[in-house]
Amino acid sequence: ALYTERGVTAEGIEKTLALDLLAPFLLTNLLIPRLKASRPARIVNVSSGGMYTQRVRVDDLQYKKGRYDGSIAYARAKRGLVILTEIWARDLKDVGVAAHSMHPGWADTPGVSSSLPSFYKITKTILRTPEEGADTIVWLAASREAADSSGLFWLDRQPRTTHVFPGTHESQEERKQLWSKLESLSGWREEKKGTG
């Protein structure tokens, strides 16, 4: 969801962070024991092309600094989700659990038309169908080919780079801080912490 104003959950967590990064962090980590028990298994995280424009801001995950911009908050959260996917891929590579992230492309969905009306008006004739946007998600979840890799970022069933603009790379220390801050916000702790 793209919010036009900064809002917080009942727990005091910025809504975009809660929905698009903290919830997948918590849910995936809670499911990992079950995924390991039912291996081979897969984690498929749906990111966004918007993440290409932003770096993760571990110093301001809750977007308290500066003027709030819902598109930027969304892109930052989706960048964080790609980072988490890479961490899970590394940590789970030897236990039969693959982790993938992907960008569905720009699809003609109610979310795009209501959250980005100007963008939608300009691009509606070239947007993908929802089915086209979902194709790579289903392929990553079910195909034999996708089971043979892990930690990649996909678009149209092809691995893609996670960085196209300078200044969007994070350091190993920022990865560790991201994981630690999400643990703190979620109340979940891992015995052997994944640290990016």
Descriptions of predicted regions:
Residues A1-A10, E14-L17, K36-V97, H103-I122:
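Catalytic loop of short-chain dehydrogenase/reductase
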Residues L2-T4, H169-E173:
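Alpha/beta-hydrolase superfamily serine-hydrolase fold, recognizing
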Residues T28-N29, E86:
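A short, exposed helix-loop element centered on a Lys and neighboring polar residues
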Residues K181-G196:
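C-terminal helix/juxtamembrane-tail motif
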